[in-house]
Amino acid sequence: MQHDSRNISMLMDFYEMTMAHGYFTKQEKMDRVAFDVFFRRNPDKGGFAIFGGLEQIVEYILNLHFDERDIAYLRDQGIFSDEFLDYLKEFSFTGDVYAFPEGSIIYPNEPVITIVAPLIDAQIVETAVLTMMNHQSLIATKANRIVRAADGRVVADFGARRAHNVDAAVYGARAAYIGGVASTATVLAGQQFGIPVSGTMAHSWVMYYGSEYDAFKAYAEVYPDNAVFLVDTYDVLNSGVPNAIQVAKDVLEPMGKRLKGIRLDSGDLAYLAKKARRMLDDAGLQDCKIMASNSLDEYTIKSLLLQGGPIDIFGVGERLITSKSDPVFGAVYKIASVEKDGKWEPRIKISEAVEKITNPGLKKVYRVYNEKGRAIADLLTLLREVPDTAEPYRYINPEQPWRELYFENCTFKEMKELIIKDGKLIKELPSLEEIRQYVKDQLTNEIWPEEQRFENPHRHYLDMSPSYYQLKLDLLNRIYRKK
């Protein structure tokens, strides 16, 4: 687990602290509660999302503390008691954290993270937990869409300079690697997370030398094993590609080396790639790769390939690192249960908008698989329930509760794992490579191709056990009877 040396314990909305002070003042700080983290819709109208950011969430929670500078700042606000500030001086997180494994394919309205902890502990982590999950889940999901659109071709992250800040660049590169990109141009991310780094030259290199031939020659002499030339500084077809070919013949081939690639960063990429490919092939450079960049995303990549653009590598920047087409993931943090006198009481938030009614109580999430290992649904159950696989299992589709529905010949996998117990890490977290491979394995073996479509993907349902559905119905009826 990578360590962030910064103390970011004050990364919270101010109301987290005002509520914490209120709970402390009312002697309720040690009441145990459960909060669920979930999201309501898939980005870009896709069929699923990818869970990212868990490692950073765990690190934040394990290192949560308030130093003298934090206490002094809070005292200066003039609304917090000395007793509360003394309590914060000794504070550390003492609760439990349950979560899906990082890299899991996730779906709307299921609790991806559940925090069970004393009231103050659970309340003050809300903002940071959401910040980390929202950002990395969004970028991992976007990266995976781009990688799938590239259809086996290499995708590289070029996004740092268009990211919204330094953390967005570095952790965005981490999330993009989880989503499937092959490398990043962000050196700090490579150093911090072990992500392969890639990059060759900018237009400034070509412009400094004055002529493309001299620029390419100089680069080839320094990097004969990794000669990739940027060919669009002046004129791709009349200058850039011809000079790249000439340097390959004059400099690289006498050294026994080959031109590794050219990069197109502007213009009609499909047209230019076709013309450049023909020129390279005619010069005996059939093994030279063509890289394209310039505001690419899954939609432009699919279009380029549909046009027959012979592009081998895509460098993707701003539309990946900002998820430009759908830049908000929208995970929320909602209380689900409160412990009173040793018994857990479920809580539910209701709304005029049906999709914003929460799923109450302590619960399990199971992924349901058919005989071939394909995931056919996710299932919410009461905490005590274990699905019986020996016979057909009845379930409720909450949108059509009158239907008699059964899972037959299916297996059930519980998705949430206990990661932190009583404030201590009890489960070793996977490496970044393991997380990345987990994503690939799920998409290859478990998730239906129909869910991976870009247009009108199949919907993966979140069903309920009859007992859990009845719990939710009883709570709704009780609340509406009180109105």
Regions of interest found by a model, annotated:
Residues M1-D31, D44-G46, A283, L296-K483:
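Gly/Ser/Thr/Ala-enriched C-terminal appendages of enzymes
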